């Protein structure tokens, strides 16, 4: 369950659904959707969506130019390899997503501890109020 103290956009971008065969992770970002069986794969796809969108908006090329190859008197065009800058940006995005998710887990743990402490405090306060003598203000 999402707590309003820790909810963020990453909850919409990386969703977990329970299915009879196990968890299903869904990466949704920039009009693209990918369903995965592992969290690691979903994080990589989410980073791929985000990095691709950033490169498209900035105008930087993601790949090297296409290469013409002559095979058996036929002209064949092969797509260029992915650029090193794109791969580095993708890896940075994966690291940042993992860091955000780790920080979110820590916040949720702290909120659970806080809620437990607060419930104990309220219970103890109610008990003290119930046993309060008449003359005490």
Predicted stretch roles:
Residues 1-137:
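Intrinsically disordered, low-complexity linkers and terminal regions
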